[in-house]
Amino acid sequence: MITTKSVENIQLLPFLATDANNLGWLGYGCLKQDRTLIVVNSIGAALQSLYILVYFYYSTTKREVLLKVLGLLALLAAGYGFFTCLTPDEDTRQSYLGLFCSTFTIAMYVSPLADLAKVIRSRSTRCLSFPLTVTTFLASSSWTLYGLQLSDLYIMVPNVPGIVTSVVRLWLFWRYAPGRDKPYRPLHA
């Protein structure tokens, strides 16, 4: 965005979804009093908020971006109201928030599956990001192991789909590597 001074090929939704995800896990970490969750998700939320500000700055449709950000803030405020005012005790609050965050995380990990069908049809991985795939695999694995260490299913379970989808994408990078399955050898001049 900064290099091109444009947001023309970049979607806002992933930034908003990741920010909401970080803020949800930050709340869960605060309820659990888990320093690791608090620190990691505070940094994640700050970075995602910065990305959103940069997106807003370079966007030509500032009103549309602002409405989406306000929609996210309204959703977060409603969630905060539900979890603080309508949920009777801290254990129930923690369980509900853990379930919400887990569901949201799973949805984020399985959402790129639509791209996988496109990759298989086109026999090309051009629409996938290799660095993002590796990073997702490492982050999902780390959070799964951390959840296992804490015996916290809310942390462990939603990260397993991240591992699975990353392994599938890594296999696709191998399977549809450039130059693989060509019936001829290119001539070099």
Question: What do the PLM-derived regions correspond to, one by one?
Answer:
Residues 1-189:
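Alpha-helical membrane-protein topology signature
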